[in-house]
């Protein structure tokens, strides 16, 4: 297929058109008074969302060059969501503002490479200031405030997440599911999660969620590889008689053994699944022992003189349920005795106190969280499926933002932190580098401008008032239309969200500004179908009878 090559300003202007269209669709969702976006689906009912990344992912433009620009910024939104869980709209609005301002300067003759260098230096300085402005999340109230802001000012969701985090701790596992009723619920169940997924997608029991869900399974723990099926046969025969599911956790399962397990699963002979044991070396042995204590089972270990053939049902652990996706396994309500679990927890605490290695301490704390923390399940309720999906997206966002806040701390929200950080930086740059830094500094006003515009206020007046406020915690509460102390009003953002949004926005905008040529496919028009009207209904074929 023929390709079209476009250079310099013409190429950048086309890319900008795509970025602008994406930004126009995403920016309307920003702030407490942001609007919804209705998205047509190829099948089923349309979805309604106020989630920036959900909107960005749906934007596909007809013009291939414009679509290239839009797709780069779409990637920024996705990456920001993956890294920080929120801030996708902020990243998109910042990327657009930086690209727009940069384009004007480069068209006027500024050197793109020097401009990029200045932008990077300004970004680095602002990130450093944001870290200085941040402070730790102190209590449950602040956790609820962060979650509420990220869930589009839904206090009920904010309080649910704060309750969940209080019950399982900041290192605990919190999952989000759909409720069977219209009410939101929080269930906390004892459980353990580790980062190993199913060994074969053929084990999946829930095709919609792509997960394996086992109810009241037996759990076989083995510390070596399983390659030969005959070693497994005795215990499999015992399991088949009980009719219960089986989860095998081993160093690996390969070849004939895995193939036979898959065949038995597909034929319905056994409800079975298998995952690799978590960790490596001595840490793997310790984690297998943790799982054994939690589930009331034994680790079948050749070092202890046990072979897989000698395993019986009495050696197997049990749990009320096990959920496995492609990356993680969660064991819920292990059948282990509480006294044994408490003894193991105390043993790990003693090891944490004794160790001098930061890495070992971190891994021991992970094991402690898995053993002592439970699994919190937030069940989201709604009246319709469309509302359910929109609400579940908001809860997922709020949960990620809350974890980010606990991890790196909080700053004042509503776009004010970026403006306060801008006021504090002092860069000594010359020429086009200074222009690059000024572009980023001017763009930092964009999130607050957009929040004010969406709420129906004069953006210029709002930005000016926040910039000139004497108290560094003063910002604009768009929901009430007032200038307030953002910390006291609970309008706060995780510093990680602001930091990641800015870094990603500067990265993609500088990439677009230093683009000098674009290569895209030329869409060829398909030839029209030939005119069939002259055939006269094939009347001339009547003589063939």
Swiss-Prot record:
Family annotation (Gene3D superfamilies): GroEL (3.50.7.10), GroEL-like equatorial domain (1.10.560.10), TCP-1-like chaperonin intermediate domain (3.30.260.10)
Pfam families on file: Cpn60_TCP1
Catalysed reactions, semicolon-separated: ATP + H2O + a folded polypeptide = ADP + phosphate + an unfolded polypeptide
Binding site for ATP: 29-32, 50, 86-90, 414, 477-479, 493
UniProt-annotated location(s): Cytoplasm
A single MF term (Gene Ontology): ATP binding
Swiss-Prot/TrEMBL keywords: ATP-binding, Chaperone, Cytoplasm, Isomerase, Nucleotide-binding
Chief place of localization: cytoplasm
GO biological process, one term: protein refolding
Protein EC: 5.6.1.7
InterPro entries cross-referenced by the UniProt entry: Chaperonin_Cpn60_CS, Cpn60/GroEL, Cpn60/GroEL/TCP-1, GroEL-like_apical_dom_sf, GROEL-like_equatorial_sf, TCP-1-like_intermed_sf
Function: Together with its co-chaperonin GroES, plays an essential role in assisting protein folding. The GroEL-GroES system forms a nano-cage that allows encapsulation of the non-native substrate proteins and provides a physical environment optimized to promote and accelerate protein folding.
Official protein name in the record: Chaperonin GroEL
Species for this entry: Campylobacter jejuni subsp. jejuni serotype O:6 (strain 81116 / NCTC 11828)
Species classification: Bacteria, Pseudomonadati, Campylobacterota, Epsilonproteobacteria, Campylobacterales
């Amino acid at each position: 297929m023929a390709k079209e090559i476009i250079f310099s300003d013409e190429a950048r202007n086309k890319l900008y058109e795509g970025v602008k269209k994406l930004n126009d669709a995403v920016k309307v969702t920003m702030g407490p008074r942001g609007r919804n976006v209705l998205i047509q689906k190829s099948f089923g009912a349309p979805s309604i969302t106020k989630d920036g990344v959900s909107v960005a992912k749906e934007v596909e433009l007809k013009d291939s060059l414009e679509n290239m620009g839009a797709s780069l910024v779409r990637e920024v939104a996705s990456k920001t969501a993956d890294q920080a869980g929120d801030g996708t709209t902020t990243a998109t609005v910042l990327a657009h503002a930086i690209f727009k301002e940069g384009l004007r300067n480069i068209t006027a003759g500024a050197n793109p490479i020097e401009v990029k260098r200045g932008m990077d230096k300004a970004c680095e300085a602002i990130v450093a200031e944001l870290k200085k402005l941040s402070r730790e999340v102190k209590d449950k109230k602040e956790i609820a405030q962060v979650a509420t802001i990220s869930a589009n000012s839904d206090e009920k969701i904010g309080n649910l997440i704060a309750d969940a985090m209080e019950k399982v701790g900041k290192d605990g596992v919190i999952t989000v599911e759909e409720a069977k009723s219209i009410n939101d619920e929080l269930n906390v169940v004892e459980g353990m999660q580790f980062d190993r997924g199913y060994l074969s997608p053929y084990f999946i029991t829930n095709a919609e969620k792509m997960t394996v869900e086992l109810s009241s399974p037996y759990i076989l723990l083995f510390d070596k590889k399983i390659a030969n099926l005959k070693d497994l046969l005795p215990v499999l025969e015992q399991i088949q008689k009980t009719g219960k599911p089986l989860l095998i956790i081993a160093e690996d399962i390969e070849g004939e053994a895995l193939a036979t397990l898959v065949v038995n699963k597909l034929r319905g002979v056994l409800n079975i699944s298998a995952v690799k044991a978590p960790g490596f070396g001595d840490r793997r042995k310790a984690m297998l022992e943790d799982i054994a204590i939690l589930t009331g089972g034994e680790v079948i270990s050749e070092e202890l003189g046990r072979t897989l053939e000698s395993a019986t049902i009495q050696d197997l652990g049990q749990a009320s349920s096990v959920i496995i996706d492609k990356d993680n396994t969660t064991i819920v309500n292990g059948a282990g005795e509480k006294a044994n679990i408490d003894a193991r927890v105390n043993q790990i605490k003693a090891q944490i106190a004794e160790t001098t290695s930061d890495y070992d301490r971190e891994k021991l704390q992970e094991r402690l969280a898995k053993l002592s923390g439970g699994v919190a399940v937030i069940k989201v309720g709604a009246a319709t499926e469309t509302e359910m999906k929109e609400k579940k997206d908001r809860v997922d966002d709020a949960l990620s933002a809350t974890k980010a806040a606990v991890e790196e701390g909080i700053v004042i929200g509503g776009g004010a932190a970026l403006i306060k950080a801008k006021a504090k930086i002092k860069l000594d740059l010359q020429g086009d580098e200074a222009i690059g830094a000024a572009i980023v500094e001017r763009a930092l006003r964009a999130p607050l401008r957009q929040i004010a515009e969406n709420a129906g206020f004069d953006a210029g007046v709002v930005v000016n008032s926040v910039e000139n406020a004497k108290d560094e915690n003063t910002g604009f509460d768009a929901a009430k239309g007032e200038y307030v102390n953002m910390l006291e009003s609970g309008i706060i953002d995780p510093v990680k969200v602001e930091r990641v949004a800015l870094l990603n926005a500067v990265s993609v905008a500088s990439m677009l500004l230093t683009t000098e040529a674009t290569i895209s496919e030329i869409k060829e028009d398909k030839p029209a179908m030939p005119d069939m009207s002259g055939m006269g209904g094939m009347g001339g074929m009547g003589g063939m009878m």
